[in-house]
Design a protein with these regions (language model features):
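PLP-dependent class I/II
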Residues: 1-162
């Protein structure tokens, strides 16, 4: 599903010569009933769109990644990864608690009546000691919206730190 920007659609396929494995997968599929109808329609369209569609999606995500990396580079005292395959980046912020910052953005901060919802990174690690000062930014918005979102993060961070 991610290959076609259908994250969350929960569609995909399995190919195997192992009949026992296929039977086990079928049991799981039957207990789940089926993916939502709209997800199936979208997946069918994506699968039949050809390689041009995939190439355009890849180009768009590369563009979004470059926008995010360039905009983040203009924020002092943060560290971030330049992902090679993921459509998100983890950002280490100069704060102790990213969850508090995320809440602050939602409840106490806005720029031109806009704010940003961030994912604190601690939920993406198996150890509770990791990611407390990190957030995850996904490249799901178009380039202009990503630029604006990072500007809001920059201004919000400045106000949050004081």
């Amino acid at each position: 599903s991610k290959r076609y920007s259908l994250c969350g659609a929960r569609v995909g396929f399995i190919v195997s010569k192992n009949s026992e494995f296929i039977q086990t997968c079928l049991k799981f599929a039957l207990t789940r009933l089926s993916p939502p109808t709209l997800a199936l329609i979208a997946a069918n369209h994506a699968l039949n769109s050809g390689e041009d569609y995939i190439e355009n999606v890849i180009k768009e995500y590369y563009k979004r990644r470059e926008v995010v990396i360039n905009e983040l580079s203009q924020i002092d005292n943060i560290k971030f990864s330049n992902p090679m395959g993921a459509f998100y980046s983890m950002i280490k912020l100069p704060i102790e608690n990213a969850e508090d910052f995320a809440k602050f953005l939602l409840t106490d901060f806005s720029y031109k009546n806009q704010t940003v919802m961030l994912s604190p990174a601690s939920g993406f690690y198996s150890s509770e000691n990791y990611g407390k000062d990190e957030v995850r930014i996904a490249f799901v918005l178009n380039s202009e919206k990503l630029k604006n979102a990072i500007k809001i993060i920059k201004l919000g961070l400045k106000e949050f730190i004081g």
